[in-house]
Swiss-Prot record:
Pathway: Protein modification; protein ubiquitination. This is F-box protein SKIP22. Keywords: Nucleus, Ubl conjugation pathway. Its main location: nucleus. The lineage of its organism: Eukaryota, Viridiplantae, Streptophyta, Embryophyta, Tracheophyta. It comes from the Eukaryota.
Amino acid sequence: MKLRLRHHETRETLKLELADADTLHDLRRRINPTVPSSVHLSLNRKDELITPSPEDTLRSLGLISGDLIYFSLEAGESSNWKLRDSETVASQSESNQTSVHDSIGFAEVDVVPDQAKSNPNTSVEDPEGDISGMEGPEPMDVEQLDMELAAAGSKRLSEPFFLKNILLEKSGDTSELTTLALSVHAVMLESGFVLLNHGSDKFNFSKELLTVSLRYTLPELIKSKDTNTIESVSVKFQNLGPVVVVYGTVGGSSGRVHMNLDKRRFVPVIDLVMDTSTSDEEGSSSIYREVFMFWRMVKDRLVIPLLIGICDKAGLEPPPCLMRLPTELKLKILELLPGVSIGNMACVCTEMRYLASDNDLWKQKCLEEVNNFVVTEAGDSVNWKARFATFWRQKQLAAASDTFWRQNQLGRRNISTGRSGIRFPRIIGDPPFTWFNGDRMHGSIGIHPGQSARGLGRRTWGQLFTPRCNLGGLN
């Protein structure tokens, strides 16, 4: 197990490797072999790390490889490692080299990687040799260590690296369909399913993927060698251009779930996870966010419905889900939802329909969502759910009427009269010189619907026009 140790005051950091069975006392002894009790450790620079029992291992405290631990020493205490001499430190600081110091050991490392390559003689020197047969920790540049810490934190994300292990185990065909199918297979395995009828050495994902349905079951259902009698779920893939459609069914039931996976969105991200060097350097955010999005989509839309279905059919306890919560918690969740969402929840199952029919719940929603609502009736005789439904229908009709008015009253022409809903003149440019017996009219012309042309050489222009602008005079 590799831990990162950072001095509380100097902020200098280095890497230390420990055994999984080591305790907190062993870690203190590695820092200060003479007086281990003078070493104070913390995860947040405020609260000291203390074990209930001296025999508790670092693993039992929740520490894993890559964790960062802050340490400090009591006044007057120091480690047994020394620098070679002050002159060496001064000469190295003049050559743009930084001295990284920790309570376990002092060493000189280059802040700039190019300088490290150009100076091969730079080395870590321990004048006193190993202390108690223990190796000194490997010093690291702070910026480099922060990058490694971020990468180590990414490695703790179980889903992306579980996915990577599955892809590496069955690597071969690198087509987009195979990549997505193996990724779905990884989510199925992580959720507790096992592949039925297909040994890892016999089944070829690339060749048989589009011709067979993958059968999965749960380990507790495998009680006989006859696989035909085992309850199972089936998963089938269909390749449709840039989209892979995944179908899932429980046993021989007619009902099925399906989902679409976009190759252009998820395949490049999965390929980046497969590339170890890229994922370590960019360990971050955008890549793993998309992987988690893929994982959650497959689990919510495909795996969980199949898992609930097979558990229900086989009489097993269902997986952790909303319906397993106590009734009080379900009612509390419903109270936090808007009325329309409660109506949608009532369509899920019989139990939810029963919980959503509570009269007091709908009375609360009426008071919360109906404007200027006044309770004038009391008792259980009032059907508050029906009241809310009436209010909601009126609200929807009002919104639809308002939308219809805006769309049909602004510039729309009435079919029966041929007139526009807005009565203002439409402005056009000057007419040609040949109009109106050779008299050219300068300026624009306002056309009013339904007005005849007068005083313009007895000509009518499209039946609807008047010179210049009508300021309200007689026609």
